[in-house]
């Protein structure tokens, strides 16, 4: 599932929305002028943001910083958005999802990129050892069945496992 432009802006991954059909003219203007401020002159509304619309639900769900609790909370919701989120979460590697939640809880907006990359490297180097990456590749690219068989289930991911993945290399 791709993130929409409006969700990317809401989440802070993007600053502005530029429709693809305007790119050629905009690129020419930028090449001629070299003035990036033209990007801000006519902001275009990116449309509806599901993340913004469900901000409180997500904030409450992810407050626990524990994948099993997040899935449990979202599963009890009667929201279509929450049910869709649970289905997407369950398709992903439980260990990678848990690690991501832990990494985000260890970092803050004031963290340096080096800190984030260090944590990412720690996990990535160890994920190879446990076969999660290989299983994801098998399901997505080799067999294309889109049905990975994760060795570790959501309910068996422990804090100790995550800490092991994130210890210094």
Regions found by a protein language model. Give the residues of each.
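Residues at alpha-helix boundaries and the short loops/turns that link adjacent helices
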Residues: 2, 20, 64, 130-134
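Gly/Pro- and small hydrophobic-enriched strand-loop and loop-to-helix capping segments
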Residues: 3-26
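Generic preference for well-ordered secondary structure
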Residues: 10, 42, 54, 84, ...
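Amphipathic alpha-helical blocks and their helix-capping loop/short-beta junctions
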Residues: 18-92, 96
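Long, low-complexity C-terminal extensions of enzymes
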Residues: 74-80, 89-169
């Amino acid at each position: 599932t791709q993130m929409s432009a409006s969700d990317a802006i809401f989440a802070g991954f993007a600053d502005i929305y530029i429709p693809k059909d305007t790119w050629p003219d905009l690129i020419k203007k930028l090449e001629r002028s070299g003035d990036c401020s033209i990007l801000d002159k006519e902001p275009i509304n990116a449309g509806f943001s599901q993340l913004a619309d469900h901000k409180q639900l997500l904030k409450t769900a992810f407050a626990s910083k524990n994948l099993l609790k997040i899935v449990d909370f979202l599963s009890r919701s009667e929201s279509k958005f929450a049910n869709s989120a649970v289905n997407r979460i369950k398709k992903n590697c439980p260990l990678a999802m848990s690690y991501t939640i832990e990494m985000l809880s260890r970092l803050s907006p004031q963290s340096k990129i080096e800190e984030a990359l260090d944590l990412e490297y720690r996990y990535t180097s160890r994920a190879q050892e446990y076969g999660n990456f290989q299983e994801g590749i098998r399901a997505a690219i080799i067999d294309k069945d889109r049905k990975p068989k994760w060795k570790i289930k959501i309910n068996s991911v422990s804090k100790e496992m995550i800490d092991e993945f994130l210890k210094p290399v």
